[in-house]
Amino acid sequence: KGTVGGKVVLVTGGSSGIGLAAAHKFAEAGAVTIICGRDQDKLDEACKEAKARGYQFVAYPADIADMADCDRFVQLLVANHGGVDFLINNAGRSIRRAIESSYDRFHDYERTMQLNYFGCLRVTMGFLPAMVEQRKGHIVNISSIGVLTNAPRFSAYVASKAALDAWTRCAASEYADQGVSFTTINMPLVRTPMIAPTQLYNN
């Protein structure tokens, strides 16, 4: 509570899974908790759940895989909230498919990079100028333990997260003396809607 109370926290992909669980924790601690996602119904349901628990979310529809929508969304939050104090880059896409099965599916790699890497960068770089000007800000990137291993069938997903991890290490060194800090969390496998299509996980 001493860290986020009264602060503006944005959780991308905050309408379900890890993002929603994190959003509840931030709101419980007194943060102005903003969530975004593509599905308005899920956003509404998340807000209803928060209200039932005695706090509230501020919800915005946004598609982090769409660069123009990222720009629109960042500008909207700067106008409405003065930017954010904490950015949780959680929105992501996972694909479980062998490389051999992807020879004619190069779009698997493109769409995974679009959301997991380029989208995160677009949002982050949109908020960085204000963070630097205020000399404060913390960016948390939700990555994967797969980056630390050699996970078969997850090359598209792991590569996109590895790219984000590498960028974050570089950014952390560049902004270390400007009041902006970065954290990477290499999450293990978590049972969320994102992994639901893979029936293997049910066992």
Language-model-detected regions and their locations in the chain:
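Conserved glycine-rich cofactor-binding loop
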Residues: S15-S16
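SDR active-site lid
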Residues: S173-N203
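Active-site helix of classical SDR
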Residues: T124, S160
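The beta1-alpha1 cofactor-binding region of Rossmann-like NAD(H)/NADP(H)-dependent oxidoreductases
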Residues: Q40-D41, P61-F73
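Active-site-adjacent segment of SDR/Rossmann-fold oxidoreductases
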Residues: A29, T149, C170-V180
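Conserved mid-core segment of classical short-chain dehydrogenase/reductases
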Residues: S94-E110, R153
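Residue(s) in the substrate-gating loop at a strand-loop-helix junction
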Residues: S144
